[in-house]
Amino acid sequence: MNKEEVVLAIRNSGANAVGILKAREFLELEEILKKRGKVSLVESDIKKRTNPFLMMKDAKSIIVCLFSYLPSNNERISVYAQGLDYHIVIKKRLEGVTDKLSENGYKSMIFCDNGPMSDRLLANLCGLGFFGKNGMLINERIGSYFFIAHILTDCELEEDKPAENTGCIGCNRCIEYCPGGALSEAFGFDENRCVSFLTQKKGELSPEETEIIKKSGYIWGCDICQKVCPHNKGIEAEIIEEFKKDLITDLKMDEGISNREFAKKFSDRAFSWRGKSVLKRNIDLFNE
């Protein structure tokens, strides 16, 4: 398959943007990741995060895709988790692309926020966006409300060059409005004060952590730094049907619901992986 055929297949899958990188060891990312230090919920081995050959020895290309989701509204669940689980939806949509690659004799692997490599850094390298002070990747056309996936393949494709982006305008609104004060100048980030991290954290919360969550109004995730970002104003992006239907914007938990019942009821939602106890704890904070 040539690049044009691959890009067309990606577009037909419902992706809003696509970029391609040559598979290589991304040594320039090692320093960035070292400076960031240990971050929860992501691969800790920097080599695995920067070397695609550890997953596919004969990899030739990395195809990076953006899938838009609905902008934030008035909710208690972060908008990314309101619709059907994006891991499942995007993987299923991209299987049409990997099937075509297979038919042409190529191997491929799909990753959507479930692989060791950094989707955001890969997307940045192939020109799909720039970083805001909130740490989100921002695309000039569709803002930052999108999921990122990538396909690793042994099909050799022409690489895309990083685009000349205008970059973050530096208004500091995300820093100003962050309920926990997790953001700071020079793109600083403290996950222990981030509402999204705290609502996913297991175990007992400290009084300060509890107050941060209650201040935000969210029981899962947080969209405030995206909601106030000027780069998300006036954007128009096509959104696939799976991310527009059966939305859950709030959640009440029956006292008697078992872990098994919870898992069955919400198995198609991105928030279900943390289990009942974390969500119930968060909900109870607003009933005190």
What residue spans do the PLM features occupy?
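Long, compositionally biased charged/polar accessory segments in the mid-to-C-terminal portions
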Residues: 264, 272-288
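Immediate flanking context of iron-sulfur cluster ligation sites
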Residues: 160-169, 210-222
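Extended alpha-helical surfaces
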Residues: 233, 239-253, 268
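Short Fe-S-cluster ligation motifs
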Residues: 198, 202-220, 251-274
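Auxiliary alpha/beta "docking" domains used to position bulky ligands
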Residues: 1-167
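Iron-sulfur cluster-binding cysteine motifs and their immediate structural context
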Residues: 173-199, 214-243
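Short, charged low-complexity linear segments at domain edges
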Residues: 139-162, 191-210, 259-263
